[in-house]
Amino acid sequence: MTKQLSRRTLLGALVAVGPAAALARVVGAQAPATPPAPPQPMTGPVFGAPPTDFKPPYPEAGKVNRLDPRLDALIDADAKVEKVCDGFLHAEGPVWVGGANGYLLTSDTQVNHIVKWSPTEGRSIWLENSGYDANGVGWAPNLREPGTNGLILGRGGLIAAGSGARSILRIDLATKKKTVLVDKYMGKRLNSPNDVVLGPDGSIYFSDPPAALVNRTGPDRELDYAGVFRLAPDNSLHLIDTMSAPNGIGVSPDGTKLYHTDGPTGWVVWDLDKQGNASNRRNFVARSVVMGGDSLKIDTAGNMWAATRGAVTVFTPGGEPIGSISTDEGVSNCEIGADGYLYLASSTRILRVRAKAKKLMFKVT
């Protein structure tokens, strides 16, 4: 990722597919002695710089890399990677809302905003205090990512992995009211939920690393492990497994597999039963193929579109890499829009590329 992202847990070099680069070791800052003040407005890659009002033709900011002819069914060889929006400190969790004429919502984790972008209206702040708020919800002395992270549609609204709120949130798309769905497991506060996905039965699966905490071993951390969880439709919370660095998460189109990107140990997959319970954990993509790995999306054909630090890499349902979309700033997440584009959360900006994939969305009653 970028310089700003070097403060995150960088588990590997900016790679898509290929030989492993050297691991970068990041030393976190010490916890402040007094509670932190609310973050100052940061509106661009340079502190105080206003976002750029991009208009078509959008500037190019990346390239498509074809590793296998099967990529042609998903992305044209001459597809352009366009920069449509900037002004983020750290973009995460993009989600497309509506049909072809809809809009994109994206978390700015360190600024505590959710940003809205559409081709017709451009960029605007959709929600301030998206995670940590003025009432101190989600406050911790060592909190460094006050905002939301992963975003999905579900339960009649927007479901957010609230890194700053240290909870899973439901945000009403009309009123923008936040409701905490869960913030504790067995009486102990969650670490900082990172990525989130909806299962076919309405279960919400999420990863919970301590990534939003400056001091990850400090007294505000109540769970002594990082985990992958399932929030059942009845709002009961179940621990699926403990992981070293849980991050991206996704569900297969038939609802029988749960995927997860854990950088230090490689990516894994579980089997899911009809009640959403996970079992039979096994390797999916070896650590030797991708070092690190961030958030991901699964399309309707079962292909995985995974942020692999410097790119979004496309994997077949069997875990074979067939191509990537690389950038010069790194990528944390992506989204398959209903407008025919794949959107990339690329550090300080949003990129897009024409794609033929269709977004996987379960119709949960």
Please provide the spans of the model-predicted regions:
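N-terminal export signals
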Residues: T2-K3, T9-A29
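Sequence-structural signature of mature extracellular/luminal beta-sheet repeat domains
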Residues: Q30-T365
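Low-complexity, intrinsically disordered regions enriched in charged/polar residues
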Residues: R8, V17-A20, Y58-A61, N65
